[in-house]
Amino acid sequence: VIQNIDPRFFNVESLEKKTEEEKRKPFLYRYFKRLPEAGKFAFFDSGWMDETVQEKLSGDLTEKTYTDRIESVRRFERQLTDNGYLVMKFFLHISEKEQEKRMEVLEKKADTSWRISKRDVWQHKHYKKCQEAYLSFMKDTSLSSAPWYMIDAESRKWTELQVLEYLTQGIDIALSNQALAVPLLQNVFPMTQMPKLSEIPLDKELDDNTYKEELDR
């Protein structure tokens, strides 16, 4: 997705464990300080959804804390869009069978086996529970001004094409309409309808020629 973007104008942020400083700061602090300046992009590989859902699944969040996190995320994203940011969130969905297949491939190679963590193994074992947790978070945080896009990620090329198309559409809309979000009124956050994971087709594939034609288009 980023290979054709001028590297001077974007950053890729991959956040895992919090630093000691970040542990003493508000939940969204480490994301806020990595926001791009005007005219630039920031791609978050994982983000506030993954952090929140993982902590909920592990039992580290009470229901009240989880609810407070949801509210904080809504306000944070609304603050961003009210200040001219284009916020686009992608959930790359694969089936349980495909997940197992990819994990097996990684585990068989000495130079990639390290990528499979205990958390990955646990998530695969509890695939349905994890999917439900992520879907619940997305339903609660998919705003009209900062929607979630659920992507069929069974095929890498098809995934890249879908993400690029959504990004292009989002940027075009943002450029034609600078006011991305409606004013904040009495904590009302319009929600967008989220499709069920079971309704997302996972059989889309592209051959090399078709992929190149679609990408060039």
Give residue spans per PLM region.
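Glycine-rich phosphate-binding loop of ATP-dependent small-molecule kinases
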Residues: V1-R217
